[in-house]
Amino acid sequence: VCRRTGRLTAPRPIRTAPYPGFPTDAQAILMAALLRCRGAAVFEENLFSSRYRHVDELARMGADIRVSGRTAVVLGVERLHGAAVRCTDLRGGAALCAAALAAEGETAISDITHIDRGYQSIEDDLAALGADIRRVEETASP
């Protein structure tokens, strides 16, 4: 594992497609990786109509993402900040985790049962790589 400093340059447009094209399942996590890129990263979701549910939550962390229909444009920002966000699905949850690792301050992700469906003990794996992360049990409101 290595950590590279600096900002990535936005790639050419990313268009999801059936195999052997770019997998729709990787779209959210790649979007999170490009939140701080130089320039604009364009995503075109060609397989599912509701694959951008994580965008509003990423915006709470300072991401600049514009969605129009099946297209999302990520305008890279200098920094992300911690926020209280809600996981809406498995892949979006992974994207929130990735963005939280790059954000300044603390991020609290709720509804993590979505993440648990696909990533068993993700907090242990990320902590083993050096992340400052812990699981906190949610308490029910009276």
Regions found by a protein language model. Give the residues of each.
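Short, structured segments at the rim of ligand-binding sites
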Residues: 1-142
